[in-house]
A protein has these predicted regions:
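Phosphate/nucleotide-binding beta-alpha loop and adjacent structural elements of enzyme active sites
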Residues: 1-222
């Protein structure tokens, strides 16, 4: 089996990996699934995914909700401000937050399939407040791309052929907060297909500091 040790050695030989990231990951094997074979994963993306799996995570007060984990903060409750960017057709995370904390969740996703899904969801208008807008580091009408390899729409134009596009309005996080009447965020979740880092840099520049951030970091334009 071609292990991660082999991959890291190859990367070092070609000068594309910093030695300090080694440590305990060297003996971890890489296993492949059918999804790996038929999807266009880059070499760097697989290395990042395998490395992240080795990171130590504090499990104290860590609670799983749907596909994500958060710190089970006693301050979270019915009055908490919770933003969830990137809905798709799965709101199990948001549903469990509502059940556990009795809170309202503000959900955002401009993709057509998500708009239809949320219009039909029983919690929309009750504990869910849904807006069909995207979040970005600038305001404007933007193009979303669907990769040939499948997955979700992304703001980043893929290197490979796309099979669909659509235009949607995007706002910055501070604009969304202002229009919603919020000055702070207790929990921010972003699963926005490679666009999270620019948003987080914009947050840093503007001094937006949520109490908790749950973010999925993808390699864009793959």
């Amino acid at each position: 089996m071609y292990t991660l040790r082999d991959k890291v050695s190859d990367a070092l030989d070609r000068g594309i990996l910093i030695p300090k990231v080694l440590g305990s990951i060297l003996s971890r094997p890489i296993t492949f699934s059918g999804r790996d074979i038929f999807s266009r994963f880059s070499r760097s993306r697989r290395l990042v995914k395998e490395f992240v799996d080795t990171l130590r995570t504090s499990t104290e007060a860590l609670a799983s909700f749907g596909n994500y984990s958060i710190f089970d903060d006693e301050n979270l409750g019915p009055d908490s401000v919770i933003y969830s960017f990137g809905v798709g057709t799965n709101v199990s995370f948001d549903e469990e937050l509502v059940t556990h904390y009795g809170c309202r969740v503000h959900l955002f996703d401009p993709t057509p399939v998500s708009v239809v899904y949320m219009e039909q969801h029983p919690l929309t208008g009750v504990n869910f407040r849904f807006e069909p807008v995207g979040v970005a580091d600038r305001e404007g009408e933007m193009t979303f791309y669907l990769r040939f390899a499948g997955g979700s729409y992304t703001l980043f134009k893929p290197k490979w052929r796309t099979i669909d596009t659509f235009q949607a309005r995007c706002l910055t996080l501070d604009q969304i907060m202002s229009s919603s009447g919020h000055s702070n965020i207790d929990l921010l979740k972003m699963d926005i297909e490679g666009a999270a880092l620019p948003v987080m840099w914009d947050m840093k520049r503007k001094g937006i500091r949520p109490q908790q951030i749950v973010v999925e970091l993808e390699v864009p334009a793959v």
